[in-house]
């Protein structure tokens, strides 16, 4: 079977205009996939040079396949049909290692056509490393490497204002563009680089904050033989992802034209502020997950897909989203409903087996950040507690018993909560405390909730009533009136 390379698989090759820090599955099935579509359908005409930012020889370099690889995008389409779409990606030209090819790395700054920098160096990547020096070849941190590359660009083109870059980080931290810019400026000052360079950084370059959203499932180890048989070639860099994707970029409106989004619309939004989109994702996507997990798991289900195929549990989740979460969010309702519809479709994706127990990790913190704001906003707006979000809190407390149908299951959270719940449920079993007292103790934990939730009118009583129903009737019976 042939292996991918440009000799045996000839096709378009594009001039290098994009530098990408990070060779991982996510960027390849997200950014490079989108660039490939834009190259095909518009005159974007931009090739990617991948820079491996860490010192490792595994996985091998994309250059072993001349930058070629296949994405397999699969899930439910807009009509709810299961689809699987294989695409040979030609947007990546080559990969270089910043550790073994440092001179080649610096040379990227000399190319007048270079315009964009994308990155995904993990959440820990946009961070300060105290020991980094200008003369390191290379520096350890990504921001320090980028500072050195930007200075090379500035020096080579004598500070020309038309040679700046649009820098678009994809790391999962809040306002990632602002965070990266601050660190680049910090290194520039610590290294005593010229004031003219610092001015050029500000005037000629854009650091754009982003919100990225796509589940990338990566190399399909269990199915690779079957998939390669269908493709007719061997691919060491096969990359699988869900059908849905969203790229929100906080940047200048001109970016839409530069990326040719005006000629071939992708699900990319150029916005003034990513904050409402971040809140939408946390509240609807993450919030629905967090409400779903303890209810569905204690109803005897194991995956998100099973839960969405269960009529009652699915109705519970959808009513929570449409009746209790969306009404208190600050974006146009039609936008929110469209996003919610995409979310429930993603939850039903038959190609992804998302285990409920793996999403249950750190459930107490997830409830505080993802659901509590909407629960309190609903109570404030209507004077009554949102029934399903409140029930989800009762289900969460019940989940920490660690037992389903007489069998134990692992509960993962910080040690404080695991010990606390062990003690509380033990006291409850021994009838030392009643349900309402147990709930009150949990809700009074100011250090966790950042407030005393026992002061929210009716919350202790309603959660205790729901919890009693779960304990006495079982989850199925208890949740049914809310479905």
Curated annotation (Swiss-Prot):
- Provide the family line: Belongs to the mannitol dehydrogenase family. UxaB subfamily.
Record has Metal-binding as a keyword: no
Q: In which pathway does it act?
A: Carbohydrate metabolism; pentose and glucuronate interconversion
User: What's in the keyword line of the UniProt record?
Assistant: NAD, Oxidoreductase
Which sites bind NAD(+)? 18-29
Reactions this protein catalyses: D-altronate + NAD(+) = keto-D-tagaturonate + NADH + H(+)
Q: What is this protein called?
A: Altronate oxidoreductase
**GO BP: any one term:** D-galacturonate catabolic process
Q: Does the keyword Signal apply?
A: no
One Gene Ontology MF term: mannitol-1-phosphate 5-dehydrogenase activity
Species the sequence originates in: Shigella flexneri
Q: What is its EC number?
A: 1.1.1.58
- Source domain of life: Bacteria
Whichever gene encodes this chain, its name is uxaB
Report the enzyme's class at the first EC level.
oxidoreductase
The cellular component terms of Gene Ontology attached to this UniProt record, alphabetical and capped at eight, are: cytosol
């Amino acid at each position: 079977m042939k292996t991918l390379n440009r000799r045996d698989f000839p096709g378009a090759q594009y001039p290098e205009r994009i530098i990408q820090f990070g060779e991982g599955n996510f960027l390849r099935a997200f950014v490079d996939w989108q660039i490939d579509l834009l190259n095909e359908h518009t005159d974007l005409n931009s090739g990617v040079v991948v820079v491996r930012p860490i010192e490792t020889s595994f996985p091998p370099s994309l250059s072993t396949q001349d930058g070629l690889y296949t994405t397999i995008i699969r899930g439910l389409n807009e009509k709810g049909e299961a689809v699987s779409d294989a695409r040979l990606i030609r947007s990546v030209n080559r990969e270089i290692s910043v550790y073994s090819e440092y001179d080649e790395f610096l040379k990227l700054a000399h190319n007048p056509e270079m315009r964009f920098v994308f990155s995904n160096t993990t959440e820990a990547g946009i961070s300060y490393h105290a020991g980094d020096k200008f003369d390191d070849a290379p520096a350890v941190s990504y921001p320090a490497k980028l500072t050195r590359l930007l200075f090379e660009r500035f020096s080579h083109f004598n500070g020309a204002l038309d040679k700046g870059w649009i820098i678009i980080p994809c790391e999962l931290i809040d306002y990632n563009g602002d965070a990266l810019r601050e660190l680049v400026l910090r290194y520039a000052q610590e290294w005593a680089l010229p004031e003219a360079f610092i001015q050029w950084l500000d005037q000629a370059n854009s650091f754009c904050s982003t919100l990225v959203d796509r589940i990338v499932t990566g190399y399909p180890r269990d199915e690779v033989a079957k998939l390669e048989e269908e493709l007719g070639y061997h691919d060491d860099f096969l990359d699988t992802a869900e059908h849905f994707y969203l790229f929100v970029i906080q940047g200048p409106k001109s970016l839409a034209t530069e990326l040719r989004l005006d000629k071939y619309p992708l699900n990319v939004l150029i916005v003034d502020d990513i904050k409402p989109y971040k809140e939408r994702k946390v509240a609807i996507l993450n919030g629905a997950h967090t409400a779903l997990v303890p209810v569905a798991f204690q109803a005897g289900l194991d995956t998100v897909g099973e839960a969405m195929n269960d009529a009652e549990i699915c109705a519970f989740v959808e009513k929570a989203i449409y009746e209790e979460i969306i009404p208190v969010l600050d974006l146009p309702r039609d936008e929110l409903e469209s996003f919610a519809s995409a979310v429930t479709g993603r939850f039903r994706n038959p190609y992804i087996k998302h285990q409920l127990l793996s999403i249950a990790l750190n459930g107490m913190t997830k409830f505080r950040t993802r659901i509590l704001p909407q629960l309190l906003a609903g109570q404030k707006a209507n004077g009554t507690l949102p029934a399903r979000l409140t029930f989800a809190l009762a289900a969460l407390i019940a989940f920490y018993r660690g037992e389903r149908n007489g069998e134990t299951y692992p509960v993962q959270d910080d040690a404080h909560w695991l010990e606390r719940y062990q003690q509380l449920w033990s006291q409850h079993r021994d009838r030392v405390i009643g349900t309402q007292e147990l709930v009150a103790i949990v809700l009074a934990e100011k250090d966790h909730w950042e407030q005393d939730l026992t002061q929210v009118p009716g919350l202790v009583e309603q959660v205790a009533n729901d919890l009693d129903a779960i304990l006495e009737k079982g989850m199925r019976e208890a949740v049914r009136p809310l479905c």
